[in-house]
């Protein structure tokens, strides 16, 4: 599963943990949305252009982020790295890309 949306600058972080099917590697990419980004309709159209794209509003982003933190805590993931993930989550203003590698 992978979600993404077009946007501005991108930063990413790789984290290791236990997924539902066993050990796995999670990829979290955060893309911030520029303030004057043009037409919202154009962005949503681009986001829905492929099967792997899904537009995420703030509510869905918050739910996905909370679920990810629960997965990582349940997998005995290091507290230091969870704090790093919390910082990345606070920096996220537009969308998040989440998938397994």
Curated annotation (Swiss-Prot):
Top-rank taxon, per record: Viruses
Annotated protein name in UniProt: Putative protein p15
């Amino acid at each position: 599963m992978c979600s993404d949306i077009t946007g501005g600058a991108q930063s990413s972080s790789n984290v290791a943990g236990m997924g539902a099917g066993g050990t796995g590697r999670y990829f979290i990419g955060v893309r911030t949305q520029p303030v004057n980004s043009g037409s919202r309709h154009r962005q949503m159209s681009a986001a829905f252009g492929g099967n792997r794209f899904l537009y995420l509003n703030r509510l869905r982003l918050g739910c996905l982020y909370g679920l990810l933190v629960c997965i990582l805590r349940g997998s005995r993931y290091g507290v230091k790295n969870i704090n790093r993930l919390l910082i990345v989550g606070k920096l996220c203003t537009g969308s998040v890309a989440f998938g397994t590698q």
